[in-house]
A protein has these predicted regions:
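Alpha/beta-hydrolase fold catalytic core
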Residues: 2-66, 90-92, 315-319
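Conserved HGGG/HGGXW glycine-rich cap/lid loop of the alpha/beta-hydrolase fold
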Residues: 52-104
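Conserved hydrolase catalytic core segment
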Residues: 132-175
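Conserved serine/cysteine hydrolase catalytic core
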Residues: 212-283
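Catalytic histidine-centered segment of alpha/beta-hydrolase-like enzymes
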Residues: 294-303
Length: 319
């Protein structure tokens, strides 16, 4: 009997040793491949922001500048927004910024507060030599940063056109659950990379209208391996409650043109979604809400419609 227990113990230790070796190899492989892949697939231009590298993509020309700002945890905002940016660039200068922790940008230890993120946006635009005022086009959580930006630097924000953006008061009703920092090990040990390559690919609807090329979808996949659950993104997740609380009951400035494009799916899923955005409006002559059929990532399915609505909105309010 003792021999059997010893044998079982040895087998168990052997399995643990194999698992440890696999995890170590996975982590080493991931951290070797990550900079190689980033260099291979890099798109746009790199600017220095607070001593770190931030990636940006600038396209088009025109009297108006639209700045596209991504949702929380988007693997590569440049890839994510590319079809929309290409369409907008026919009439406008378009800038896509990849926050720290996203896409090809570095990680950062700076707190993911409204103040810091907005200052990084401003510094990046200055480094790109792109002058304002800007039309901010935020998706999801970037609606919070855009509101903060407009309130604190009104001369730099000409308008906001939101894509199913977060609203400050939503966390009064539904707090974000904190994410433990040790989850970043999932990223640094390459487990997200392993998952993306070993498990079947699930269709999240990103390419529902074939906006993206095969190469772009490939880059998005590797960017997911780089960035999912990294420490910077986790820090940003854990700042959502504080960042929204800072703007509780705040409304848009009365003289700021705003168009909130809401996703029909989100409105149907959350009874309060429309109300939360109506609460922000102070001037119905300049500020409006439009509901588009589709999911939270409206630019995956409605790029042409967003461009059409944007052109009408700018023509009416900003010319």
């Amino acid at each position: 009997m003792k021999k059997i227990f010893k044998l079982i113990g040895k087998v168990f230790l052997g399995i643990l040793a194999i698992l440890a070796a696999v995890i170590i190899i996975s982590g080493i492989t991931h951290n070797i491949l990550k900079p190689i892949e980033k260099n291979k697939y890099k798109i746009g231009q790199t600017v220095q922001v607070d001593g770190s590298n931030m990636q940006a993509y600038v396209t088009g020309a025109g009297d108006k500048t639209i700045v596209l700002l991504s949702g929380l945890g988007t693997a590569s905002p440049i890839i994510d927004f590319m079809p929309l940016a290409e369409r907008l660039s026919k009439d406008y200068k378009v800038v896509i910024l990849e926050y720290f922790g996203y896409g090809f940008s570095d990680l950062t230890k700076n707190e993911r507060s409204n103040k810091n993120i907005v200052n990084e946006i401003r510094e990046a635009l200055k480094a790109l030599d792109v002058s304002g005022p800007y039309i901010l086009m935020p998706h999801s959580i970037s609606g919070i940063y855009s509101l903060y930006y407009a309130l604190n630097y009104p001369n730099e924000v000409e308008a906001i056109i939101g894509i199913d953006t977060s609203a400050p008061n939503q966390t009064k009703r539904d707090k974000y659950e904190p994410m433990p920092s040790f989850l970043s090990l999932i990223n640094s040990l390459g487990i997200m990379r392993d998952k993306s390559y070993l498990l079947p690919v699930t269709d999240n609807g990103m390419n529902i209208n074939n906006y993206y090329t095969a190469e772009q979808m490939k880059i998005n996949k590797v960017a997911t391996a780089w960035n999912s659950a990294n420490r910077t993104v986790l820090e940003e997740v854990n700042m959502v409650n504080a960042n929204t609380e800072e703007l509780y009951d705040v409304k848009y400035p009365e003289d700021l043109p705003v168009l909130a494009l809401l996703a029909r799916d989100t409105v149907d899923e959350s009874q309060e979604w429309l109300t939360l955005h109506e609460e922000l409006i102070t001037n119905t002559k300049l500020q409006d809400i439009e509901i588009l059929n589709g999911g939270h990532y409206l630019h995956w399915s409605n790029a042409d419609k967003i461009v059409e609505i944007t052109e009408k909105f700018i023509s009416k309010n900003l010319r």
